[in-house]
């Protein structure tokens, strides 16, 4: 199984890019991981929120491959502790045949088409974070889950 992360828009801040790359490199010791960045929609000032979600949704769905298991990072999704998330990933490693793909949506969330294509929704917190920050936090949580599953001394209860 591979893990994929689809995000909308590039990461601008160098310190986030550096930290994201650090955790992406660490993850490669445990599981194949890829992050796909969908470019920001151009001329968003001329679009309604719904139109922007639709355009982003089309690009998200286009990035999927046959057999992908789609999980949305959504404020209304199921919340996990780090230990619970590691168990969740372990189960998915045994049941998802190809790619487990997580998606961070755009500023207004997901289109109905993306919600319909998704198998699950998970939430990292009831708080709101910037899209750039959530990428780092989520990749770190995947790394943390891998260290938990391998009984390595990274996570402390």
Curated annotation (Swiss-Prot):
Swiss-Prot/TrEMBL keywords: Cytoplasm, Methyltransferase, rRNA processing, S-adenosyl-L-methionine, Transferase
Reactions catalysed: pseudouridine(1915) in 23S rRNA + S-adenosyl-L-methionine = N(3)-methylpseudouridine(1915) in 23S rRNA + S-adenosyl-L-homocysteine + H(+)
Top-level lineage group: Bacteria
One GO cellular component, as annotated: cytoplasm
Binding site for S-adenosyl-L-methionine: 73, 105, 124-129
InterPro entries: Alpha/beta_knot_MTases, RlmH-like, tRNA_m1G_MTases_N
Pfam family, one: SPOUT_MTase
Top EC class of this enzyme: transferase
EC number: 2.1.1.177
One example GO MF annotation: rRNA (pseudouridine-N3-)-methyltransferase activity
Subcellular localization: Cytoplasm
Family: Belongs to the RNA methyltransferase RlmH family.
Quaternary structure and interacting proteins, as annotated: Homodimer.
UniProt function note: Specifically methylates the pseudouridine at position 1915 (m3Psi1915) in 23S rRNA.
Protein name per the record: Ribosomal RNA large subunit methyltransferase H
Taxonomy of the source species: Bacteria, Pseudomonadati, Bacteroidota, Bacteroidia, Bacteroidales
């Amino acid at each position: 199984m591979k893990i994929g992360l689809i995000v909308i828009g590039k990461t601008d801040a160098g310190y986030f890019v550096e930290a994201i790359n650090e955790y992406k490199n660490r993850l490669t010791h445990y599981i194949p991981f890829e992050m796909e960045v969908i470019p920001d929609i151009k001329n968003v000032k001329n679009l309604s929120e719904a139109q922007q979600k639709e355009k982003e949704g089309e690009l998200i769905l286009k990035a999927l491959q046959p057999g992908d298991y789609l999980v949305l990072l959504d404020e209304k999704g199921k919340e996990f502790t780090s230990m619970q998330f590691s168990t969740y990933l372990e189960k998915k490693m045994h049941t998802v045949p190809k790619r487990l793909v997580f998606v961070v949506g755009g500023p207004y969330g997901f289109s109905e088409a993306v919600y319909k294509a998704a198998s699950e929704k998970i939430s990292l917190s009831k708080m709101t974070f910037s899209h750039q920050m959530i990428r780092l936090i989520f990749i770190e949580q995947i790394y943390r889950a891998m260290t938990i599953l391998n009984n390595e001394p990274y996570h402390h209860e």
